[in-house]
Regions:
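Terminus-proximal functional modules
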Residues: 1-59
Length: 59
């Protein structure tokens, strides 16, 4: 497994909005981690995203 070099959490008020920003992130090298979370307090959807060190050779 490659080392995570960057990590962020995307959030949006709708699933459709989250889908748009997650797909935009994927197009520039971000990868989703796990599933989508929803906060009943903020009424937002969340997706963890990471970039990995692709230069590491883990044999």
């Amino acid at each position: 497994m490659n080392k995570i070099t960057e990590y962020k959490v995307y959030n949006a008020s709708t699933l459709e909005g989250l889908e748009i920003i997650v797909n935009a992130g994927i197009s520039v090298g971000w990868q989703p981690i796990g599933g989508i979370a929803f906060s009943s307090i903020t009424m937002n959807y969340f997706q963890s995203m990471a970039k990995y060190d692709t230069t590491t050779n883990n044999g």
